[in-house]
Amino acid sequence: MSQCTVEYNVSEITEYVLSTLGERCQSAGIVIPTVIIYGTIFLLGLFGNICTCIVIAANKSMHNPTNYYLFSLAVSDIIALILGLPMEFYQSLDYSYPYRFSEGICKARAFLIEFTSYASIMIICCFSFERWLAICHPLRSKIFSTLWRANVLIILAWTISFVCALPIAFIVQINKLPLPEDAKYQPWTNKVSTDGIFVLHTEFCAMNQSRPDQQKMIIIFAFTVFFVIPAIAIVIMYAHIAVQLESSEIDLKGDKMVKKRRNKSNRTVLKMLLSVVITFFICWLPFHIQRLLSVYTTWSETTTISPPVQFLSMIVFYISGFCYYSNSAANPILYNILSQKYRSAFCRTILGDHIANFVFKGHQRPGQSKRCSSSTEAEQRTLMTRGSVRVDKPHRKLEVHNY
């Protein structure tokens, strides 16, 4: 009998396991696209974020607060990709249950993914605040926006994220599917269970299924504190920045050319950072929707879930997975698309001056400077700036929060 086949000596138990946990193995129609998409995300994300760290570290002209935040964000993305995607690959190719690994691995993976997701949003809040301060309160910015303060905020962000993610390590465990009440005292019970409590071969890594209230509390806390509140704060800050830049265009005093250049530089940087923020929230919204769906469709008076809700949960599962990991690969692409100065530093650092100039030589229009040619120190000084966990088994009818 294939390992993918769910079959017990008692047909009622077979139906119960299938209706609750779903099939053990995913179909080829799901596995192949999933592996291709995740493989592409993994390679692009890992390469792009490692290059981002190298570019920022290797160019002293990029050692400024905003780039320190972007470096930290790249580190968070690298951790998420390395810890998350290999397990996604494995679970796509292997059977979904029983869980093969130890409870320590189960807890560690869940904690680290939650930890890095919290760190990402806190870093995004930090560089949004830094830009808001620099444009709307420039005098205060000169005191606040220093490398030392940026390092302190980054350490603080990671520390807070670590502490807030700790509950995950305590509530996540290897669960087993409990026997139905009417099956606990049957003559055939010992054929499907060794302890008379749980069904054989149904282990899965997830939050403790006997503590639904705590599961809800953690997911709602993460959604509120690390998604809704940051989103509101960031919208307010960028709205204030937009108003400030618009008013500065109208009321240009002193050296108009200097102020125009400064505003243009600010707008370029803001365009890139705002793209990072928007991408983050677009990619993470399905993730949080899926987590909320998982707890509010699972923990009701009955475990029966209507077919439309099952279908919606499955669709949101796939969308949330692809979006969640796509966000980790998107930032380096945005930097290259939206920042010519980053492209220049990227090409010079990764490819070298001679190779970069040769590669891009044929792509220059008359009078246009080479995109990867060496920039002056003054140009580089302004480079790029002036101055949580899904349910693992999509096909289950009972959507539990898995890792």
UniProtKB/Swiss-Prot annotation:
Gene3D superfamilies: Rhodopsin 7-helix transmembrane proteins (1.20.1070.10). Pfam families: 7tm_1. The keyword Cytoplasm does not apply. GO terms for biological process: neuropeptide signaling pathway. Its main location: membrane. Residues 49-68, 131-151, 238-268, 326-403 are cytoplasmic. The chain crosses the membrane at residues 28-48, 69-89, 110-130, 152-172, 217-237, 269-289, 305-325. InterPro entries: GPCR_Rhodpsn, GPCR_Rhodpsn_7TM. PROSITE patterns: G_PROTEIN_RECEP_F1_1 (PS00237), G_PROTEIN_RECEP_F1_2 (PS50262). Residues 1-27, 90-109, 173-216, 290-304 are extracellular. It is a multi-pass membrane protein. GO terms for molecular function: neuropeptide receptor activity. It is found in: Membrane. Putative G protein-coupled receptor for pyrokinin-like neuropeptide derived from the processing of the neuropeptide precursor capa-1. This is Neuromedin U receptor homolog nmur-2. It comes from Caenorhabditis elegans. The lineage of its organism: Eukaryota, Metazoa, Ecdysozoa, Nematoda, Chromadorea. The gene is nmur-2.
